Regions:
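Long, basic/Gly/Ser/Thr-rich N-terminal segments
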Residues: 1-42
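Conserved substrate/cofactor phosphate-moiety recognition/catalytic segment
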Residues: 69-112
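Conserved phosphate-donor/acceptor-positioning beta-strand/loop module used by diverse small-molecule
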Residues: 153-173, 205
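Small-molecule kinase domains that catalyze NTP-dependent phosphoryl transfer to phosphate-bearing small molecules
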Residues: 178-218, 230-233
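Glycine-rich phosphate-binding loop used to anchor ATP phosphates in small-molecule kinases
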Residues: 108-154
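P-loop (Walker A) phosphate-binding loop of NTP-binding proteins
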Residues: 59
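Conserved lysine of the Walker
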Residues: 64
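Hydrophobic anchor at the beta1->P-loop junction of P-loop NTPases
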Residues: 56
């Protein structure tokens, strides 16, 4: 016999449940509304079992996708990982590769991918599944800035910046292949612009000397502080 249902995880609670349609066996899912901040914890928040929406920001080679995957894999509550680069590459024929130049077409596909990520994140959260997204969000370009993420996911999105040293991102970029590998000059340019996050009020993790598991642990610590005192952005 099945035991009693487990209590829901703390954090974002999503939409009220939708009654089951007993005539067809179809299982309706709650609609995904804007993600709000988790309610204040009575004590120290247990980030590993709290339903959250996280945005991991960083330059190419920062390790954000690897960290996001590891973090999602090792949580105590259901957690999804969405990489904007992966979603953008869903477009096969007609893919506007930003490496070929940033133009109206590549910007439109970026915006579409971001909106798709936001829609997915809201639906995951509405159904009790945490979500961590990763994207190279620039502090000095509103088009690819935080405003769009906040608009598409909701005010409860928790942004965190991964920013290792330049030599680290150059080494990691050299290990890449295909259209994910950039020139050293482009990597250095992106890394320099990402330094603009210093002084922004967002939490920043320098993972130059940290492996992926250690970075994920620091991410948990940063998120606990963000829940207790949300960053202004």
């Amino acid at each position: 016999l099945a035991g009693p249902a487990a209590p829901p995880a703390p954090g974002f609670t999503g939409s009220p449940g939708v009654p089951r349609d007993t005539t067809t066996g179809h299982v309706p899912l709650p609609p995904g509304g804007p993600v709000t901040m988790p309610p204040p914890a009575t004590g120290a928040p247990d980030v590993t079992s709290t339903t959250l929406a996280v945005l991991l920001i960083g330059p190419a080679g920062a390790g954000k996708t690897s960290v996001a995957k590891y973090w999602a894999d090792h949580r105590r509550v259901p957690t999804a990982h969405i990489s904007l680069d992966d979603v953008r590459e869903w477009v096969r024929s007609g893919f506007a590769d930003p490496q070929s130049g940033w133009n109206d077409n590549s910007e439109a596909q970026y915006r579409l991918a971001r909106r798709t990520c936001g829609f997915s994140a809201r639906n995951f959260l509405a159904n009790g599944i945490s979500c961590i997204l990763d994207d190279a969000v620039f502090p000095d370009r509103p088009v690819v800035g935080l405003g769009g993420w906040k608009r598409h996911v909701g005010p409860g999105l928790l942004p965190v910046v991964l920013l290792p040293g330049l030599e680290i991102v150059l080494e990691r970029n050299a290990e890449r292949s295909g259209n994910r590998r950039l020139t050293d000059e482009e990597v250095a340019r992106i890394h320099g612009r990402m330094a603009g996050w210093y002084g922004s009020g967002l939490p920043i993790i320098d993972n130059s000397q940290l492996d992926v598991p250690a970075t994920a642990r620091v991410l948990d610590e940063v998120l606990a502080r963000s829940i207790a005192s949300p960053p202004k952005w």
